[in-house]
């Protein structure tokens, strides 16, 4: 099982319940159905004001305070509540035994190093897999910890980077979706030949109405930030799926006796992705956010108007609220049932 960003958390939770997969899925679903923002980050007025004040201070007189590191904000929001939730809900201490008993072949989570610029996949495996090295990305065999999960899901600017030891030194990591050129590769390196890809990308979603009818208004900060984050989080998977499909097509044209001498092998993919635009879904739930967070986003141009999806992409990265997560789960179930024959 491999995962990146929020997918790393889901992957780890599934892996920790690999001896009873159905129970693990139900447990994860129960958490997502009852989710609230305060389980992920400090969403109260004091926490939001404290973070906002630090950023304002940095912008206004940061040049004068540069020598005082403790004044520099590390992120927009504090995700200590998420750390507590992970410790409670993801018992990583079970992994070695599950791997040893054959319930799980491997778990891999990916994060992006701010220190080296490399994209690193951390993995535990039953097989003696040699860590791979490719251009700007590599793998490291390691005991997966909650720090790895926090690093993989540390959305840039929004959540703080996490320090993890790599090759006997500490590097600081952020969200694994950054600079991720080959999200399917870890599963292939770990030996998978049939891969179920569950993503939040744009492969199956309808065309954006805003693209057909662009607004003449200057984009808000929220719209610009949402566009930038969407490019980070949503585009790489679709490109990698197309790459694997092209390689499969090429291999199908090569005679089997010659293909046997190649390191390449065909990979069977089944891709499940949303059939609706997630920013449109998010726009219906912006009003569910805690008032302090909604006020902060409002200053950037996010509105609670369900018809206005322009800033909703940014809000979707903070929308850890039950109304939104339940609608996403219902969408995922419907999209999967629509593909029941392939599944």
Label the predicted regions.
Residues 72, 100-193, 197-228, 310-319:
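Active-site gating loop/helix substructures
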Residues 73, 77, 81, 86, ...:
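C-terminal helical/tail subdomains of lipid-metabolizing enzymes
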Residues 2, 110, 196-198, 268-272:
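Hydrophobic/aromatic beta-strand patches that form the interior of the parallel beta-sheet core
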